[in-house]
């Protein structure tokens, strides 16, 4: 179980790092600029250089901040993000544990991450961080209500909150054909949830103050930075599980469960 946990964390971290590089490449293409092109072949190892810089950078704790909670909040947020992937979203066997109420479990973890964001701004003792933390937390919690109502309707149709039930229900007919217009609204809400353009309300690229992470740097800033991309990747997987046939398309790769604990 310990080995599987370590492998899972490494695989997810590498996927998230690749997503960060892909997003930067796409943004540079849209904005007609070069983008990352120095480290590795055409900049493909840029995420390794960024990670090395962040992990070797020192951490300064503000004099008025609570040192314990200042360090604990990003650590808790990082733990919440990794806990997402211990659920059975990979497949029936490729998970550390399986719970009957997978959708509820994911929603609770998402709400907990929003609380971490709010408390992060509060314990920084910076008025800009406090305002940004409240703004981000209120936005995330309000969106969770909408997502909860939407997924509740879908779960009533499937008569279960389990990812396995969604896989069985969609063996013949995908739910995307029933909830196409609803999915378009969900995608807009997900953009709001993960603070992606044009809904980057909690933190805009044009602002000098980086929201609730204003006082953070180095390793602790990297945890929040990865947390946003964890949400982005997890919500993408969640949409695939709920609307696009679950893990039925991954059946050729399910032989890997023989090599897991």
UniProtKB/Swiss-Prot annotation:
Pfam families linked: NADHdh
Phylogenetic classification of the source organism: Eukaryota, Sar, Alveolata, Ciliophora, Intramacronucleata
Family: Belongs to the complex I subunit 1 family.
GO molecular function terms listed in the Swiss-Prot or TrEMBL record: NADH dehydrogenase (ubiquinone) activity
InterPro entries per the UniProt record, alphabetical: NADH_UbQ_OxRdtase_su1/FPO, NADH_UbQ_OxRdtase_su1_CS
Originating species: Paramecium tetraurelia
Descriptive protein name: NADH-ubiquinone oxidoreductase chain 1
Compartments in which it is found: Mitochondrion inner membrane
Cytoplasm recorded as keyword: no
């Amino acid at each position: 179980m310990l080995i599987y946990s370590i492998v899972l964390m490494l695989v997810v971290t590498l996927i998230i790092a690749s997503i960060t590089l892909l997003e930067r490449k796409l943004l540079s293409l849209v904005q007609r600029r070069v983008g990352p092109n120095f480290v590795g072949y055409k900049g493909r190892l840029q995420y390794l250089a960024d990670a090395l810089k962040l992990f070797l950078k020192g951490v300064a704790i503000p004099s008025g901040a609570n040192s314990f909670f200042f360090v604990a909040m990003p650590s808790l947020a990082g733990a919440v993000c990794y806990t997402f992937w211990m659920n059975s979203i990979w497949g029936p066997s490729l998970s550390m544990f399986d719970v009957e109420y997978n959708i509820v479990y994911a929603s609770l973890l998402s709400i907990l991450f929003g609380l971490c964001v709010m408390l992060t701004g509060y314990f920084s003792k910076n008025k800009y961080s406090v305002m940004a933390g409240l703004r981000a937390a209120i936005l995330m919690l309000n969106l969770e209500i909408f997502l909860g109502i939407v997924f509740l309707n879908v779960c009533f149709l499937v008569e279960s909150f389990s990812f396995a039930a969604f896989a069985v229900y969609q063996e013949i007919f995908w739910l995307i054909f029933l909830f196409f217009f609803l999915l378009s609204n969900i995608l807009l809400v997900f953009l709001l949830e993960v603070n992606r353009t044009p809904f980057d309300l909690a933190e805009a690229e044009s602002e000098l103050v980086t929201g609730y992470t204003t006082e953070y740097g180095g390793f602790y800033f990297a945890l929040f930075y990865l947390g946003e991309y964890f949400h982005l990747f997890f919500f993408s997987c969640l949409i695939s599980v709920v609307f696009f046939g679950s893990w039925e398309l991954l059946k050729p790769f399910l032989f890997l469960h023989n090599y897991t604990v």
